[in-house]
C-alpha cells in the first residue's frame, strides 16, 4: 500500500487514494471497539444514563435518546465507577442550583470539527446563550452554522457540555436531544441561579 503521511493537527493522517482515515466512520469505529461503564440516575429532567470510558465521561444519554445519536461500544453497569459517581454528585448540585461549572474529565469521541464545537460549548457561561452563528465564528468557520448545528445535535455529553445554551439566531429555542421542554427547563434553572 502506498500513501502519504501528513501532520494533521498533532495527529497523523494517512491518505491513500484521497481517502482521509480520520473520517467520522473511522473515529466512531474506534469508539465502538471500547467497552464503557454506565450508570442510570434519576434527575429533575428524567432518567439519565451516564457513560464513562477509562479516561473520562463519554456521554450523558436521555431516557428516550435516539440510539444513533451517540455512537458507543458495549456498555456495562458499574454504579461505583469513580467518574460516574462524581458526575452524579455534580449533576445533583447543578440541579439544586449549587453548581454553575462542572469539573470532570471528559472523553469526547467525534471528528475534529465536532470536538471543536463541543469545546466551544464549554466556554458558554452559566445562564447565557449563544447562537449557532456565534459558535461558528468562535471556532473559525463563520459560514458553518449549519454544520455547527449538526455537531451540537450530536453532542454526547449533554448538560455538562451545555448544548442547551445554543439557540437560533433570533434567540428561539431550537432542537435538543432531551426535547425542547427540557431545554427550556435547563435554561430557566440557570437564569434563576445565574447570580451564583
Model-assigned labels for residue ranges:
Residues 1-33, 174:
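N-terminal amphipathic/basic-hydrophobic helices that include classical n-h-c signal peptides
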Residues 21-142, 189-196:
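Basic nucleic-acid-binding alpha-helical/helix-turn surface characteristic of O6-alkylguanine DNA
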Residues 146-155:
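Regulatory, non-catalytic segments
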Residues 156, 160:
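Major-groove DNA-recognition helix of helix-turn-helix-type DNA-binding domains
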Residues 163:
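Short cysteine clusters
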